[in-house]
């Protein structure tokens, strides 16, 4: 009977854990440098969108993940900047029981995927408060971005090994 309890306890310890501890806005900025005259121009926006993540271990099995979103909208005809919106949506997560690749996937895909709806809503609200037409960011496939990143890493590693072999000969 006690062996079964030990086996169950050992199995529970090995189970992967991903828990949200806190989600918060770390930084936010909205600039509309050409108001009010921008509204007198024809609204043909050109949208620039950048997305990145930062990860910091803040304790045992505790990680802060920051999703950085930057949106810059200019008018096609004049090139004038309509607005710049920057959001750093962050969260602290308890993560344990994962191997290296699984941990990387969790930190760069799963956690940002949880943060994105909050960031998207904040961007939409800021643009709305600037009295610009609605901006609804499309969903982001963080899994595809992770696979793309891993493929780039593998290609770079293969290239480095190839260069090392060529210098040896």
From Swiss-Prot:
Pfam families from the UniProt entry: SecB (PF02556)
Main localization, broad class: cytoplasm
SUPFAM superfamilies: SecB-like
Subunit structure: Homotetramer, a dimer of dimers. One homotetramer interacts with 1 SecA dimer.
Function: One of the proteins required for the normal export of preproteins out of the cell cytoplasm. It is a molecular chaperone that binds to a subset of precursor proteins, maintaining them in a translocation-competent state. It also specifically binds to its receptor SecA.
Official protein name in the record: Protein-export protein SecB
Record-annotated membrane-spanning stretches: none
Keywords: Chaperone, Cytoplasm, Protein transport, Translocation, Transport
CDD domains per record: Translocase_SecB (cd00557)
Gene: secB
Gene Ontology annotations for the cellular component aspect, listed alphabetically: cytoplasm
InterPro entries: SecB, SecB-like_sf
Record NCBIfam families: PRK05751.1-4, secB
Gene Ontology annotations of biological process type: protein folding; protein tetramerization; protein transport
Keyword hit for Cell inner membrane: no
Compartments reported by the entry: Cytoplasm
Entry similarity comment: Belongs to the SecB family.
Entry GO MF terms: unfolded protein binding
């Amino acid at each position: 009977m006690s062996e079964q309890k030990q086996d169950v306890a050992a199995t529970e310890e090995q189970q992967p854990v991903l828990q949200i501890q806190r989600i918060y806005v770390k930084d936010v900025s909205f600039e509309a440098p050409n108001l009010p005259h921008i509204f007198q121009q024809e609204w043909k926006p050109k949208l620039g969108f950048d997305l990145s993540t930062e990860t910091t271990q803040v304790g045992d099995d505790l990680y802060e993940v920051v999703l950085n979103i930057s949106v810059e909208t200019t008018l096609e005809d004049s090139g004038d900047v309509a607005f710049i919106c920057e959001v750093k949506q962050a969260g602290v997560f308890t993560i344990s029981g994962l191997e290296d690749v699984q941990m990387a996937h969790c930190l760069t895909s799963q956690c940002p995927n949880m943060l994105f709806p909050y960031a998207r809503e904040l961007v939409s609200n800021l643009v709305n408060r600037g009295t610009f037409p609605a901006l609804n960011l499309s969903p982001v496939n963080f899994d595809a971005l992770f696979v793309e990143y891993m493929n780039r890493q593998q290609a770079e590693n293969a290239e480095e090994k190839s260069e090392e072999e060529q210098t040896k000969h």
